[in-house]
Regions:
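Glycine-rich, flexible beta-strand/loop modules in the N-terminal catalytic cores of phosphate-handling
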Residues: 41-130
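Short, conserved phosphate-binding/catalytic loop or strand-edge motifs used
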Residues: 130-138
Length: 165
């Protein structure tokens, strides 16, 4: 996980001590064994371009849309990919509705970087007519519940949506 996202929540001395003691005792708050993974469910919606990922108690819904646009001058043969994240106020008490907060922006950047660096979306394949028409792909991720592994759940949802493009 990117260190900047982790730094948005500060641990108290007691919380740090609790975590260290739990790790030394092979205990997890949710009752899983140390090497046990969270249950994952991936669903693709009835509508094209929608998905839902549940990773343990974390719940992410996503939607991919596209429109034909003129390409950027410096990338005449490539379409575009944009990631937007939004936290539901019910996802976590620290998240506020309205304009995307720092955590939402950072999560979007992490997912965007992961998709680009893995080349999960070939932006050249989004070109319809060189210099004239390309696809602009937009992936919207809605965080409905944050029960841990948020970066993983968001990445899985975005990857699933990108495969639907």
């Amino acid at each position: 996980m990117d260190g900047r996202l982790a730094n948005t929540w500060k641990l108290t001395v007691n919380e740090k001590k609790f975590i260290e003691t739990a790790l030394a005792s092979n205990l997890r708050i949710d009752g899983r064994n140390p090497l046990e993974y969270r249950k994952i469910t991936i669903k693709f919606g009835r509508e094209d371009g929608s998905s839902e990922v549940q990773l343990g108690q974390t719940h992410v819904m996503g939607l991919v849309t596209g429109q034909l646009v003129q390409p950027y001058q410096d990338r005449q043969n490539e379409g575009t990919l944009s990631i937007f994240t939004e936290f539901s106020p019910m996802a976590d008490p620290s998240f506020e509705p309205g304009r995307p907060g720092e955590s939402a922006v950072e999560l979007g950047r992490i997912v965007d970087r992961g998709l680009r660096e893995s080349r999960a979306v070939d932006t050249e394949s989004l070109c319809v007519l060189a210099g004239k028409l390309v696809w602009a792909i937009r992936i919207d991720l809605h965080i409905l519940d944050n029960g841990g592994n948020l970066v993983d759940a968001a990445n899985i949802a975005a990857l699933g949506l990108s495969l639907n493009v």
